[in-house]
């Protein structure tokens, strides 16, 4: 559960956006970063840790197994990066079809987006 340095990498319910109002407030803040496959919407929160929500539209990933794969990749990347991310509410939203994308390309895109987040 924890790495040798002692960083907690669990993905608990406290690290997720659950309610529609939480998602709406992040979208209403209107700050976003765009990558090759994903958009990362963000909003500072008053907590000590980052929280994540994932949106994958059927229009961009028609098959359920592809949508689930994209969500799993996003959650796993967030879980591994959460301790170094600023205290923001984040929404990872797919904005380009992933039919030809590899898992490595999706991971790299997310890693670059998380790295570009303002550290406020």
From Swiss-Prot:
The organism's place on the tree of life at top rank: Bacteria
A GO cellular component annotation in the UniProt record: ribonuclease P complex
Enzyme Commission identifier(s): 3.1.26.5
SUPFAM superfamilies: Ribosomal protein S5 domain 2-like
Subunit structure: Consists of a catalytic RNA component (M1 or rnpB) and a protein subunit.
Catalytic activity: Endonucleolytic cleavage of RNA, removing 5'-extranucleotides from tRNA precursor
Keywords: Endonuclease, Hydrolase, Nuclease, RNA-binding, tRNA processing
InterPro entries: Ribosomal_Su5_D2-typ_SF, Ribsml_uS5_D2-typ_fold_subgr, RNase_P, RNase_P_CS
Organism the protein comes from: Azoarcus sp. (strain BH72)
Biological function: RNaseP catalyzes the removal of the 5'-leader sequence from pre-tRNA to produce the mature 5'-terminus. It can also cleave other RNA substrates such as 4.5S RNA. The protein component plays an auxiliary but essential role in vivo by binding to the 5'-leader sequence and broadening the substrate specificity of the ribozyme.
GO biological process: tRNA 5'-leader removal
GO molecular function: 3'-tRNA processing endoribonuclease activity; ribonuclease P activity; tRNA binding
Pfam families: Ribonuclease_P (PF00825)
Record family assignment: Belongs to the RnpA family.
Protein name: Ribonuclease P protein component
